[in-house]
Each structure stands twice: as structure tokens, then as C-alpha cells.
Amino acid sequence: MAKEELLEFPGEVTELLPNATFRVKLENEHEIIAHTAGKMRKNRIRVLAGDKVLVEMTPYDLTKGRITYRFK
């Protein structure tokens, strides 16, 4: 099975939601719901409102994503 192509977009966290999910506004003005990636949870990287992040999305559902990096 081939690995699916993931889309990566920079964005900004606008709201914290329950269960480690976040509302993220992408640079192209779209708003999505994103959760933190497993490695970020494992290393206890905190994500707060206003943080600049890198979001990974699948081309099949462009309303959900995964936060893979928090910019310093």
C-alpha cells in the first residue's frame, strides 16, 4: 500500500478545544480542527493559542489536520 501524499500548511492556533485539539487558521485563511502529533505528545510540547504551527493534512479531508511542528 502506497503512503498517501500529505499536504503541509503553516498556520496559527486560534482556540484551544477539549481532548488536545485546536482550531487553527491557515495562511490561506481557512480554519481547520487539528490535533497534536504523537511525537509532540510524547515529548510534552505545549501548544497555546497564538502559536505558529505546521499542520499536516490529507487531501481527502481538508477540514481536519495534525500539528507536526511548533515554531519558536
From Swiss-Prot:
SUPFAM superfamilies found in the cross-reference section: Nucleic acid-binding proteins
Any single Gene Ontology cellular-component annotation: cytosol
CDD domains per UniProt: S1_IF1 (cd04451)
Xref: Pfam families: eIF-1a (PF01176)
Principal location: cytoplasm
Subcellular localization(s) per the UniProt record: Cytoplasm
Molecular function terms, GO-annotated: ribosome binding; rRNA binding; translation initiation factor activity
InterPro entries documented for this protein: NA-bd_OB-fold, RNA-binding_domain_S1_IF1, TIF_IF1
UniProt keyword list: Cytoplasm, Initiation factor, Protein biosynthesis, RNA-binding, rRNA-binding
PANTHER family: TRANSLATION INITIATION FACTOR IF-1, CHLOROPLASTIC
Protein name according to UniProt: Translation initiation factor IF-1
Annotated source species: Maricaulis maris (strain MCS10) (Caulobacter maris)
Gene name tied to this protein: infA
